[in-house]
Amino acid sequence: MTNSDFKIALLVLYIFIFLFGTLNVILMSCMLQSQRHLSFTKVSVINLIAVHSIFLLTLPFRIYYYASNKDWILGMYFCKIVSLMIHAHMYLAFIFYAFLLIVRYVEHSSQRHKLEFHRILHATIASTTVWLIIFGSMFPVTIYYGKMQNDSTQCFHFGKALEQPSVKIFNYGTCTLVILVWSVLAFFQVYFLLYVSKTFGKATCQRQEFWAQLKNVVFLSVMFFCFVPYQGFRVYYVSEYGKTAEIHHINEVFLAVTAFSCFDMIVFAGRDVCKLINSRGWFNCL
C-alpha cells in the first residue's frame, strides 16, 4: 500500500470514530441521569465519558490533516498534544476498564452488598489521582517528545525516539504490562464463569449472575480488540523500527483501532440504549 492509501484508511477510521464516538458519549451521559447512587461503576463511567470527550475534541485536527493532504500548520507543540492524546485516551480508558472489572469481581466475590462511594469527595480524589498520574507522567514527555523531528510541517512522525535504548525499554515494559494485566483479568473472568456454571448447573443461563459475568466479558472483549493488538504489534514495531517505511503506517492504523473503545457503551448497553431512546426520545437527551 502507498502512503496515500494509508492516509485514506486513517481518514475513514477517524471520521467513523468521531461520529459514533460522539454518539456514544451522548448516550452514556443520558444513561447516567437515571442512576442516583454514586457507585464505583458510575464513577468509572463518568471518567470514561470525560476520557472519550477530551480525545474526541482532538480528532477533527487529525481528520483535517489527513483529508487536506497539506502540511501541518499548527506548530510542533500542538502536534505533540494531539499525538499524545490518543495515547492518553488509550491508557486512561484501559485503567478505568480494569478498575471497573476489578470492582465487579469484588462485588461478585462478596455478594452481600454493592460497593458505593459514600461521599462525592472520595470519588473525586480517586479519579483525580488517576488523571494526575497519567497526565503528570506525560507532561515531561510532551516537552521532550519529538526532539529528533526537525520538520514542523509533518505531524505524527516521532518514531526516531525509538532509536534510544531507554525509550525502547520503556515501550517494551508498557506493552508487556498492558498485556499482562488483561491476561490476569481474563483469567479471573474465566474462573468466575466456571464458578457460576458449576454453582447453578443447567439453570445458569436463567441466573442474573451469569448475565452480569457476560457484561464483564464485553468489557474484556473491548479491551482485547482495541488495545491488545496495538500493544502486541508495538513490540514488533519497536524492534523493527526504521527497516521499512510501511511499518510506521501499519503502527498508525493499529493506534487508530485503539480509539474504537469510544463505542464501549453502545456495545455494553445496547439493549438499554434502545430502551432509553424509545422511552425518552432522542431529543430529551440533548
What are these regions (language model features)?
Residues 90-125:
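Class A GPCR helix-loop hinge within the 7TM core
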Residues 1-26, 38:
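Extracellular N-terminal segment of 7TM GPCRs
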Residues 1-11, 72-85, 154-171, 207-210, ...:
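Juxtamembrane membrane-interface segments at transmembrane-helix boundaries in membrane proteins
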Residues 225, 232, 249-286:
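Seventh transmembrane helix
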Residues 119, 136-180:
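Loop architecture of class A 7-transmembrane GPCRs
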Residues 14-17, 27, 31, 54-70, ...:
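Helix-to-loop junction signature of class
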Residues 191-232:
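Intracellular effector-coupling site of seven-transmembrane GPCRs
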Residues 6-11, 41-43, 47, 51-100:
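Extracellular TM2-ECL1-early TM3 structural module of rhodopsin-like
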